[in-house]
């Protein structure tokens, strides 16, 4: 069993849990995921690793309760436990395999939409730990859906935008990216976009126009008899 140390609602319908999983914490890297199962009857659910603490032996996950199993998960509290917590799985971020000195020469920008902020954070944290501070643009529908602001601002140059203008500035993440490049003189060697498919589509249309190589992250779930996920970055 994998004990839950912390459980909280980060924002409206977005939840965060810190789980005791020493082996996973020891070996995971940004971009990887775990498969969790709350109980014997529950589905196996793939969730991106949002953070990890090797010394404490913990993994942080962030999720939105959409299906039946994740709706049950949100009711778990500190002291409860997952039956299964398998990982780390999937390919780490490409940054983890690059030469650090070469990576330090790159100008990197991340664009995150909604809960897509969760898989962006560990990549920013890893880069920061290796002496690289990237730019990060976080977009949300409204102020109440902005998550991990404190954590993100500690490891990146953070820009926040909301669809309704209720926090910082009104607009889309693409509006901020265009402004940074065309009006503030920023230049980027690579863009990483993680969020809703429609958001990533418009980021790619913009970065194509701006001639910025772009990586997007897609996490479709393939329901086989084992209910295993497939993850890919394009």
Whereabouts are the PLM-identified features?
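A very general structural signal that marks isolated residues within well-ordered alpha-helical segments
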Residues: 37, 179, 230-231
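Short, functionally important structural connectors and interaction interfaces within domains
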Residues: 20, 39, 65-68, 107, ...
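Conserved small/polar residues in nucleotide/adenosyl-binding loops
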Residues: 2, 224-230
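Ferredoxin-reductase
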Residues: 2-80
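FNR/FR-type flavoprotein reductase catalytic core
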Residues: 71-221
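Charged, low-complexity, helix/coiled-coil-prone segments
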Residues: 15-22, 56-61, 114-126, 144-146, ...
């Amino acid at each position: 069993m994998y004990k839950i140390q912390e459980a909280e609602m980060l924002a409206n319908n977005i939840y965060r849990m810190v789980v005791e999983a020493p082996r996973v914490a020891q070996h995971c890297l940004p971009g990887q995921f775990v498969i969790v199962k709350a109980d014997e009857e529950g589905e196996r659910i793939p969730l991106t690793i949002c953070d990890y603490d090797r010394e404490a032996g913990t993994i942080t996950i962030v999720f939105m309760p959409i299906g039946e199993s994740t709706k049950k998960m949100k009711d778990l509290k500190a002291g409860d436990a997952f039956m299964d917590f398998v990982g780390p799985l999937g390919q780490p971020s490409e940054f983890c395999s690059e030469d650090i000195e070469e990576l330090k020469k790159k100008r990197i920008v991340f664009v995150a939409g909604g809960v897509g902020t969760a898989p962006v954070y560990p990549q920013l944290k890893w880069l920061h730990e290796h002496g690289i501070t990237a730019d990060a643009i976080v977009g949300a529908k409204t102020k109440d859906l902005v998550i991990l602001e404190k954590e993100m601002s500690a490891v990146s140059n953070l820009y926040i935008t909301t669809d309704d203008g209720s926090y910082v500035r009104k607009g889309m993440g693409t509006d901020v990216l265009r402004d940074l490049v065309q009006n503030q003189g920023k230049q980027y060697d690579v863009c990483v976009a993680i969020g809703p498919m429609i958001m990533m589509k418009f980021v790619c249309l913009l970065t194509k126009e701006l001639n910025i190589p772009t990586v997007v992250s897609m996490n479709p779930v393939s329901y086989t008899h084992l209910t295993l996920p497939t993850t890919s970055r394009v």
